[in-house]
């Protein structure tokens, strides 16, 4: 028994000694440091632009995309838009709206300065708005007429208010214009700005400042920008961004292969496969704000069958829209589910998708009283159903038209194609002198989803309700949606509108094309949402980086 107690004592002493040693070792151990790579400043990004240099001035870049791309980096707007099409502050720190929705009060960021160090003030906004309101034909007519209805009143150097004649919910979307420096240009009209030296060495308030022009044989071949250290959103990581001009997409791609550029601003469908097979080059695609649609004239005296919603739905079911995207557009489009773009905050994702199903189309037509004659032609009351499709006389639209013609022939409908110049196509829409028209609707004016101009009853006579769709309930929804400042109510109203559009199908939405561009994989943290303009690819350029370090 005594021997046993000694054994227990030895075990306890040994355990105590081991514990002391372990405690000592643990107290001497140093914590392991884990390095987390973080973006650091440095590097240069060079991008190929397709087109020519004209002038760097956001009031004059409406018709030249390369200028708009560069201006996006040089200048700032009052508001910009997130991936869902919602307005967020840019130069504007915040804003408020009056209870009746007619007065918008804005406060500018106190740390916003021009590239020459001068603070951005209310006077800069007032001057820029005055240019938009000017009688110059350099401002698009619809934009000029809109701004003539708006008054701007300074409150202080950093605050002001806009007054509208009536409540207009999409107003914020019209504030994406880029602001010009009044202290440098304030005594100049828009026409006087056209040939002003400012356009060759602009001063903006954006994340990058103008550095220099590249020239060759008297022609401008490139533009160099440098990160602006005092940008109100924080200095960008990439030190320099350079742009080089090329005549076409293929020449730009060859320049990438030769190491001249790091990015391609636009990819042609013909070059898509080469880009996909290029090691180290990342392809990015974003939906464009352009809807390819077949407008149906619901009041056409020569095509009364278009007045039947069931017939219109059969037309839609018979169209192989995915086939059009794959065969003609090389996959560079997404199916349209209605008049509001997918990804936008107002898009309702529970609409019918109208799958390609010729058998379903035939059955629907039979249920409506249509029948096929001995030659397989669709008839109603013994008369053949024959329609005419007007379309633009270019290879892409002609190829799409031929697929539509074949699809509808498969259900017995004879369709005659009428290719026309674009201007004539638009003129026929405006005069309602058509049966069916294939056209692309440009929805890029603002990211706001408001489809009022194309589908409201008030736009039937003299407006852009080309289909002449008469649905008083849908029109009421659209009227209310553009007047209320209640976001949740607007969303509900647009949902209700889309449900009615889906049920009645006054025209045939086909697809939204996508914009494709490519950037070398050494450029990191490129994040893209839907594009409302190709220049939107630079929305988060401040976060792009090339190098990392440890913190």
Where are these regions (language model features)?
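Detector for C-terminal structural segments
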Residues: 15-22, 292, 318-352, 395-405, ...
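N-terminal lobe/hinge region of extracytoplasmic solute-binding protein
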Residues: 48-99, 130, 203-205
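A structural "hinge/loop" feature
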Residues: 51-68, 91-93, 118, 171-180, ...
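Gly/Pro-rich hinge or "lid" segments in bacterial periplasmic/extracellular proteins
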Residues: 72, 82, 177-236, 240, ...
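Aromatic- and charge-enriched surface segment that lines or borders ligand/interaction sites
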Residues: 93-138, 161-163, 252-255, 305
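Surface-exposed binding/hinge segments that line
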Residues: 143-188
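Ligand-site clamp/hinge motif
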Residues: 196, 228-274, 405, 414-416, ...
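Append "and occasionally in soluble cytosolic enzymes with long acidic Gly/Pro-rich linkers
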Residues: 214, 219-229, 284, 306-406, ...
């Amino acid at each position: 028994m005594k021997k046993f107690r000694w054994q227990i004592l030895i075990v306890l002493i040994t355990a105590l000694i081991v514990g002391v040693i372990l405690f000592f070792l643990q107290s001497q151990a140093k914590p392991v440091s884990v390095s987390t790579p973080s973006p650091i400043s440095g590097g240069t990004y060079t991008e190929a632009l397709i087109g020519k240099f004209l002038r760097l001035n956001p009031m004059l870049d409406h018709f030249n995309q390369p200028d708009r791309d560069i201006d996006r980096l040089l200048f700032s707007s009052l508001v910009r838009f997130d991936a869902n099409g919602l307005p967020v502050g840019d130069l504007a720190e915040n804003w408020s709206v009056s209870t009746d929705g007619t007065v918008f009060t804005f406060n500018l960021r106190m740390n916003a300065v021009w590239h020459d160090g001068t603070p951005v003030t209310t006077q800069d906004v007032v001057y820029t708005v005055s240019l938009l309101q000017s009688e110059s034909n350099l401002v698009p007519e619809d934009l000029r007429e809109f701004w003539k209805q708006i008054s701007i009143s300074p409150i202080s150097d950093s605050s002001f208010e806009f007054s509208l004649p009536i409540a207009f919910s999409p107003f914020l979307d019209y504030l994406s214009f880029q602001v010009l420096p009044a202290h440098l240009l304030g005594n100049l009209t828009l026409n006087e700005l056209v040939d002003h030296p400012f356009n060759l060495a602009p001063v903006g308030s954006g994340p990058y400042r103008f550095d220099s022009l590249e020239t060759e044989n008297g022609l401008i071949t490139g533009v160099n920008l440098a990160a602006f250290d005092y940008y109100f959103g924080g200095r960008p990581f990439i030190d320099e961004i350079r742009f080089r001009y090329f005549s076409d997409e293929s020449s730009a791609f060859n320049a990438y292969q030769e190491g001249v550029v790091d990015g391609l601003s636009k990819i042609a469908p013909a070059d898509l496969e080469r880009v996909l097979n290029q090691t180290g080059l990342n392809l990015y695609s974003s939906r464009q704000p352009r809807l390819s649609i077949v407008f149906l004239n619901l009041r056409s005296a020569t095509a009364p069958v278009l007045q039947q919603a069931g017939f219109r739905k059969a037309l839609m079911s018979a169209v192989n829209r995915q086939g059009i995207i794959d065969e003609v557009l090389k996959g560079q489009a997404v199916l349209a589910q209605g008049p509001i773009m997918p990804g936008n905050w107002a898009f309702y994702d529970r609409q019918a998708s109208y799958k390609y199903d010729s058998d379903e189309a035939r059955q629907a037509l039979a249920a409506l009283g249509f029948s096929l004659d001995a030659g397989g032609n669709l008839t109603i009351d013994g008369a053949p159903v024959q329609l005419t499709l007007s379309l633009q006389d270019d290879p892409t639209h002609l190829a799409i038209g031929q697929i539509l013609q074949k699809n509808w022939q498969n259900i017995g409908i004879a369709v005659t194609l009428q290719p026309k110049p674009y201007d004539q196509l638009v003129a026929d829409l405006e005069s309602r002198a058509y049966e069916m028209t294939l056209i692309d609707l440009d929805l890029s004016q603002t990211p706001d989803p408001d489809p009022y101009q194309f589908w409201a009853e008030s736009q039937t006579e003299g407006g852009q309700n080309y289909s002449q769709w008469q649905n008083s309930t849908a029109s009421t929804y659209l009227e209310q949606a553009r007047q209320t400042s209640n976001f949740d109510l607007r969303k509900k109203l647009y949902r209700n509108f889309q449900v009615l559009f889906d049920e009645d199908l006054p025209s045939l939405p086909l697809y939204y094309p996508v914009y494709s561009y490519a950037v070398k994989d050494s450029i990191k943290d490129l994040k893209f949402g839907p594009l409302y303009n190709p220049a939107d690819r630079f929305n988060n350029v401040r976060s792009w980086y090339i190098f990392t370090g440890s913190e």
